[in-house]
Amino acid sequence: LKGWALMGLGRVGDALELFDIASEKKGMRSFALYQKALAFCLVGDFESAEVIFSETDKTGTGITFRGSLVRAKILMQLERKSDAIDFLQEFHGEDAGQEVRALIAQLQAGAAIDFDMVRSGSEGAGEVLFGLAIALQNGEGHDGLLLYTRLASYLAPSNVHALLLSAQLLEELGNYGLAIAAYDAVPRSHPAFVSAELGRAQALSQFGKTEMSIEVLMQLVESFPALRRIHETLGDLLRQEGQYERAVRSYDIAIDMINQSRPKHWYIYYARGSAHDRLDNWELGLRDFEFALSLSPNQFQVLNYLGYSLVERGERLEEALSMIERAVAAQPKAGYIIDSLGWAQFRLGYYSDAVVNMERAVELMATDPVVNNHLGDVYWAVGRKTEARFQW
């Protein structure tokens, strides 16, 4: 922050020296050098800024989503349009959001793109606070992070990403009304509008306004039909609301947009498979579950769902048991998966093992009626009928 205060006073050399000193501290190198690169941009030295980014790129660390936009705009100032496009496409891949797609389209059209990521010492200070919030997301409490993002927005009002992070933090704190208002503050004309609307739809759903949430997503589908993430998000919401046929249609559209299936795509096949299953289209669901496992063989959600479903159907029981055991190994404290294991053991006649695991599942999920009912069935099978009646 002091470095950016010095930048605001025009003491560029002193500021750069401070950023260098900060970069030598443990765990601060990438963060401090990013600030130094932005400082170079503020004074128009894009060559020096790109030197920092190119070195960071070699190490494979330190470039964030916002940092990727910064670098692309630096390359544009250096009249390296092709390099900017190649970098964005490689960094974001086929799952690039509307903000990145819009920038690539501008680059391909030859539009003049100014460097507008940092335009003053104040905005640079806002970048520091926003960067700290990003870096500390998995450690510090959301209240503290929200202070950083709100201050970042105050110092750098044009930093829409700080506003989006504030909305996300408010949502995670359960302040859905404030989160919706924050998402709604992103201008429709801004390339990040789609991300904001996706966030608003999720917040509306959690706020109990499901129909409004679906309407927001339907409008996005109409306006941005080529964005796979919108169709997948709509599919998830429709599936959660029990509208399985509509969910499958949304998932179908999203899957058709995948050029090459990769491990990260396991979820959408799993989600479509569960929707097929709820529609009693088991063969279609099974195909999706097995394909999801081919993409990510140790994905515990798929292993548990498929294993439990096979047990319920009385099919491939030993294989189903093996799947659930692998899921438990990945998530040893997940009560619902331990319940699946105990139930599979019960169905296979391994009653002693079933009792141990069902009791453990009830410890973890004491109020769940299905788990308690399963334990009752297991107790009955081993002759503990009084305890079984109590569980039922």
Annotate each language-model stretch with its function.
Residues 1, 35, 70, 103, ...:
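Canonical tetratricopeptide repeat
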Residues 4, 38, 73, 134, ...:
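Residue-level recognition of tetratricopeptide repeat
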Residues 7, 41, 76, 137, ...:
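Position-specific recognition of the canonical hydrophobic site in helix A of tetratricopeptide repeat
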Residues 24-26, 58-60, 93-94, 155, ...:
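Structural marker of alpha-solenoid helical repeat scaffolds
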Residues 32, 67, 100-101, 128, ...:
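TPR alpha-solenoid repeat register
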Residues 113-128, 259-266:
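TPR-adjacent "capping" and linker segments in tetratricopeptide-repeat scaffold/adaptor proteins
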